[in-house]
């Protein structure tokens, strides 16, 4: 098979893995030094970093052959799809060629399981090692780690990759047993623990070799089973707490041609995936717990965002006096983000906050109005019941512009 044909197959096969954001890696550059590449965003941009940089990654599988038969996966053993396999040398060549053409800033590399977990992990490491040592490539590298691989291989991968990740796959162990019986939650979490241990050791010892400086992430498939959002968020919360993950990515299940009856024939609403990302951001950045966002079983509402849903369910905290409230509570007001909350706190050291200041800070006034008090404003909507406010603030369908 020609290299271009392999690329067509294995780039398409990698599209279902969404955990490829190049985030948190220290900036490195070969400018003025020996070597090749940089982690600075340039060229065609596809992924966004937390500081706003855009980076383009070559996102491929080493192979889509796989020993496992996960029911939700397009590359499962029983799937009738075109198969291909790169050699490590071919991936190195592609990465360097794309970089020299200014098409990418880094590499995201995953793989189906071939021969064994250790053999597959060795092949992935071989790519990263050659890029770093033989070609002095200083761009971003994200490697998928293989559950059940030897911890020594995980440690070696961390020396060459900016980020490592291992997919938790599904929100519950029972779903994993039913849909991917060849995988075990224990081995997945053991790999997460190995990565976390490597990060901890690298931070504790100044002279320790670098180890995945952008941390680790994971991916959870949404809608392949009946798990509700409350369980999903509690699972994510546990992963953040136990293994200090940088990100949990949520991927709405995509129906696969000729898929088994054990998985749905319809995809979940993409808006559900979006709401989970919003809720996840509130847990990571705003101090919300999963129990606050969903106090019981069920899914996040689709018509309003999770922050607004929390505010409507906790009206006793509102309206908030912006001239007196704690910064953490100001950040929980719908329509006011972390940065705006910090600016408001800084501003009130100089003067009393007025409603026009919210406009200047570009807060979302429609959302914020029912929940804030300023020197010259007190909401008339504050006494309205939550159901009425929800109806007014819900994100209803909008007519698309014709041009």
Q: At which residue positions do the language-model features occur?
A:
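Flexible, acidic/Gly-rich N-terminal and inter-domain linker regions that tether
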Residues: 1-65, 372-373, 380-394, 400-403
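Conserved, mostly hydrophobic/aromatic
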Residues: 57, 70, 109, 166, ...
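Canonical Radical SAM [4Fe-4S] cluster-binding loop centered on the CxxxCxxC motif
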Residues: 60-89
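Conserved AdoMet/S-adenosylmethionine-binding subsite of the radical SAM
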Residues: 92, 96, 115-293
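Short Fe-S-cluster ligation motifs
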Residues: 94-110, 279
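C-terminal extensions
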Residues: 300-329, 355-403
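Residue-level signature of tetratricopeptide-repeat
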Residues: 347-348
């Amino acid at each position: 098979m020609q290299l271009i044909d392999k690329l067509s197959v294995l780039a398409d096969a990698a599209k279902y893995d969404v955990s490829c954001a190049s985030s948190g890696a220290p900036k490195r550059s070969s400018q003025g030094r020996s070597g090749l590449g940089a982690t600075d965003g340039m060229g065609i941009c596809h992924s966004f970093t937390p500081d706003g940089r855009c980076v383009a990654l070559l996102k491929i599988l080493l192979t889509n052959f796989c020993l496992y038969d996960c029911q939700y996966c397009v590359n499962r053993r029983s799937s009738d799809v075109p198969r291909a396999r790169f050699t490590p040398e071919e991936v190195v060549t592609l990465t360097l060629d794309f970089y020299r053409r200014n098409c990418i800033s880094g590499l995201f590399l995953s793989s189906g399981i071939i021969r064994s977990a250790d053999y597959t992990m060795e092949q992935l490491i071989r790519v990263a090692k050659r890029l770093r040592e033989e070609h002095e490539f200083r761009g971003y590298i994200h490697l998928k780690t293989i559950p059940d691989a030897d911890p020594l291989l995980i440690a070696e991968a961390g020396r060459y990759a900016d980020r490592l990740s291992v997919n938790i796959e599904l929100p519950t162990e029972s779903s994993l047993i039913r849909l991917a019986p060849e995988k075990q939650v224990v081995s997945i979490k053991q790999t997460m623990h190995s990565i976390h241990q490597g990060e901890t050791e690298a931070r504790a010892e100044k002279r320790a070799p670098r180890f995945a400086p952008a941390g680790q992430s994971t991916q959870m498939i949404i809608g392949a089973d009946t798990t509700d959002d409350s369980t999903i968020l509690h699972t994510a919360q546990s992963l953040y707490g136990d293994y200090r993950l940088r990100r949990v990515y949520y991927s709405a299940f995509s129906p696969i041609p000729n898929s088994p009856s054990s998985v749905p024939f319809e995809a979940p609403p993409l808006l559900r995936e979006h709401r989970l990302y919003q809720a996840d951001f509130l847990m990571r950045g705003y101090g919300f717990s999963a129990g606050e966002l969903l106090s019981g079983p069920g899914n996040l509402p689709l018509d309003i965002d999770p922050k607004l849903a929390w505010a409507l369910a906790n009206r006793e905290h509102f309206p908030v006096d912006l001239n007196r409230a704690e910064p953490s509570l100001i950040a929980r007001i719908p329509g006011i983000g972390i940065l705006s909350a910090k600016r408001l706190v800084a501003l009130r050291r100089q003067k009393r906050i007025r409603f026009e200041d919210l406009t200047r800070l570009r807060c979302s006034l429609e959302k914020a109005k029912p929940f804030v008090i300023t020197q010259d404003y007190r909401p008339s909507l504050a006494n309205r019941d939550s159901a009425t406010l929800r109806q007014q603030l819900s994100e209803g369908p909008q007519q698309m512009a014709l041009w």
